[in-house]
Amino acid sequence: MESRNFKLDTEWNVIHYPERPNGFGILTIGDERHFVNSSSSFWTQNEGKRSLLNIWKKEGYTVFYSNLYGRHWGSEKAVELTLRLCSHIVRNEILNTSFHLVAEGMGALVALKLLKHSDFKIRSLVLINPVLSLSTQLEQEKENKFFYKKLVAELEAAYETDINTLLESLDGESSRPAFNNDTPVKIIHVLSGNRAYKQSSIIKELSVEWEKDDLPVTISYVLPEKMLQVGSQIVQFFRKHEQVL
């Protein structure tokens, strides 16, 4: 069996099986284009994602992910479902219970909340063009009325509350992600478009703090045409953190 689609709550999920399993699992959390339905997913339909998936499977990794209510923007509901998905995988598959995690864009918001769960062990964390703070994202989008309006509507739907209540809850939230000494992090920044360059300057500023705190965070900048190399870069990073079972 190459893959299995199954439902948790109202959401479709997928697990992809390698031919020769190495015993390690990769949980992926996608960005705004990500989707999963009963028979397909963004990871199988998008050429770039499919090649990443194939590289990981070829190396023996079992890969799994959820539709996560679509544009979740790091909502608690999405975090809870991710934890449920991981419990399901632990119960039903023969895998090391400490997973690698790859999150892209808004998926990073869920990943950062998972880092705070003491009972959830992340073996290593890869963030691709991550959104590291909701308040910073809102601030950035204010420059473009159309995108800001769209983002506000998505946030209200994801968090099931009005924007003012959400802004109040974000008030005082640190724009610095809560990385720790136990979880190695690799940030991959693909430099395409104006927004990506803005994000990269935010990451550069934050990296000074991470270095000061001696946190295990590395950053790679990648040009879009070099994206195919990202899959093997990620595998090399994973392997470094598989010595301790």
Label the predicted regions.
Residues H72-I94:
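Alpha/beta-hydrolase active-site loop
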